[in-house]
């Protein structure tokens, strides 16, 4: 009996403590629904369609509101004005990376995506500079993407026009582009080492994006004590880390500081230059984690966008016909598309932008955090508070994009048929934490899609009206439903 009383008292104290901690901060933070003890507002959120839940809350509490995902407050920014004010106008104050316990457990704050403070600044600066040195925005990386696009075309020809699921083959191309930047060499699509590498990367991205991981991130104690797919992430990451450290070792043995070949070489040279500095951020641990970030952010997201783009082109054959007419007129059939062509292909450029806007791949992006105590609008947000931005609310803003739920390249064309930029276009997020590989991803999407459409007619297995383009929401990303198509050589 004494044990029962003790447990009851303990539980009551925990609940009262939770209620006190939540109520003590609510006078300063933006408004929001009343949280339950311990679990917060978790039961009020649809983990498979978080962005819709945010839209519903914004109607009740305005564009800046607070949710408790577990016992900690999270500030939500909904709509273009709130997102712009935070991430662009006050970018430095919102440049922290918000809480992501599962990533913190396996990556331990290394790399560029989940790091903070000086480490993040150093790794991001180095990554951007190295991508430029390797030819980002120049011919060097463009040549690699063009080569990969042609290899992809050859693989698609092997299907001989028969029905196929494009998931695997569209994953190979972006992964190989990253491999060529990191290791200097690409792999054959059937190479065993390449297949294992791709499988581990893709599996980790899928698990990290799953609803179960959103639960684990809200209740970190589950990570160590509950069975589940999250344990597979640790095993996969350890495999990838071991693989990358072996590659780094090979690079060390053949390094020529006067002639860097790839990302690893540039990092090792930088490491030599700063090895006299105490607490230098350029450790092998940081290198392995940064490479892992480049693979994770640069393969699955691009391949999913490509896969969704082909589905939309099947659904809207009139759009496909206009794009292919533009390719025939500007590029022809006797050379590969190049980035210089894009400025002469406004409809194709608009189509690719519309794909990214429409699919809304990462509805809430990765969490931010405020780097100091700040006053935002009329609210006080304490240092370290996690901030989530609803990119969906920006990309699907009906004032900027009339009929936002419709796929229409006209959203990015003016009355003269010329390409029209939009400040609301932020599929890569915006501000200080905008995706470091944005330029590479845009290049891949343009060159790979135009090369495919230059060489093939896309044939659906069903009538376009029967094609389902409804996204499969998995909690973090919007994925296309499974489908098959035929690539008919032109």
UniProtKB/Swiss-Prot annotation:
<keyword id="KW-0492">Microsome</keyword>
<comment type="pathway">
    <text>Lipid metabolism; arachidonate metabolism.</text>
</comment>
<feature type="modified residue" description="N6-acetyllysine">
    <location>
        <position position="252"/>
    </location>
</feature>
<dbReference type="InterPro" id="IPR008068">
    <property type="entry name" value="Cyt_P450_E_grp-I_CYP2B-like"/>
</dbReference>
<feature type="modified residue" description="N6-acetyllysine">
    <location>
        <position position="249"/>
    </location>
</feature>
<dbReference type="InterPro" id="IPR002401">
    <property type="entry name" value="Cyt_P450_E_grp-I"/>
</dbReference>
<dbReference type="GO" id="GO:0020037">
    <property type="term" value="F:heme binding"/>
</dbReference>
<keyword id="KW-0472">Membrane</keyword>
<dbReference type="GO" id="GO:0008404">
    <property type="term" value="F:arachidonate 14,15-epoxygenase activity"/>
</dbReference>
<dbReference type="InterPro" id="IPR050182">
    <property type="entry name" value="Cytochrome_P450_fam2"/>
</dbReference>
<dbReference type="GO" id="GO:0005506">
    <property type="term" value="F:iron ion binding"/>
</dbReference>
<keyword id="KW-0479">Metal-binding</keyword>
<keyword id="KW-0503">Monooxygenase</keyword>
<protein>
    <recommendedName>
        <fullName>Cytochrome P450 2C29</fullName>
        <ecNumber>1.14.14.1</ecNumber>
    </recommendedName>
</protein>
<feature type="modified residue" description="N6-acetyllysine">
    <location>
        <position position="375"/>
    </location>
</feature>
<keyword id="KW-0256">Endoplasmic reticulum</keyword>
<feature type="signal peptide">
    <location>
        <begin position="1"/>
        <end position="25"/>
    </location>
</feature>
<comment type="similarity">
    <text>Belongs to the cytochrome P450 family.</text>
</comment>
<keyword id="KW-0732">Signal</keyword>
<keyword id="KW-0408">Iron</keyword>
<dbReference type="InterPro" id="IPR017972">
    <property type="entry name" value="Cyt_P450_CS"/>
</dbReference>
<dbReference type="GO" id="GO:0019369">
    <property type="term" value="P:arachidonate metabolic process"/>
</dbReference>
<dbReference type="InterPro" id="IPR036396">
    <property type="entry name" value="Cyt_P450_sf"/>
</dbReference>
<comment type="function">
    <text>A cytochrome P450 monooxygenase that selectively catalyzes the epoxidation of 14,15 double bond of (5Z,8Z,11Z,14Z)-eicosatetraenoic acid (arachidonate) forming 14,15-epoxyeicosatrienoic acid (14,15-EET) regioisomer. Mechanistically, uses molecular oxygen inserting one oxygen atom into a substrate, and reducing the second into a water molecule, with two electrons provided by NADPH via cytochrome P450 reductase (CPR; NADPH--hemoprotein reductase).</text>
</comment>
<keyword id="KW-0443">Lipid metabolism</keyword>
<dbReference type="GO" id="GO:0016712">
    <property type="term" value="F:oxidoreductase activity, acting on paired donors, with incorporation or reduction of molecular oxygen, reduced flavin or flavoprotein as one donor, and incorporation of one atom of oxygen"/>
</dbReference>
<dbReference type="Pfam" id="PF00067">
    <property type="entry name" value="p450"/>
</dbReference>
<keyword id="KW-0349">Heme</keyword>
<dbReference type="GO" id="GO:0005789">
    <property type="term" value="C:endoplasmic reticulum membrane"/>
</dbReference>
<dbReference type="InterPro" id="IPR001128">
    <property type="entry name" value="Cyt_P450"/>
</dbReference>
<feature type="binding site" description="axial binding residue">
    <location>
        <position position="435"/>
    </location>
    <ligand>
        <name>heme</name>
    </ligand>
</feature>
<keyword id="KW-0560">Oxidoreductase</keyword>
<keyword id="KW-0007">Acetylation</keyword>
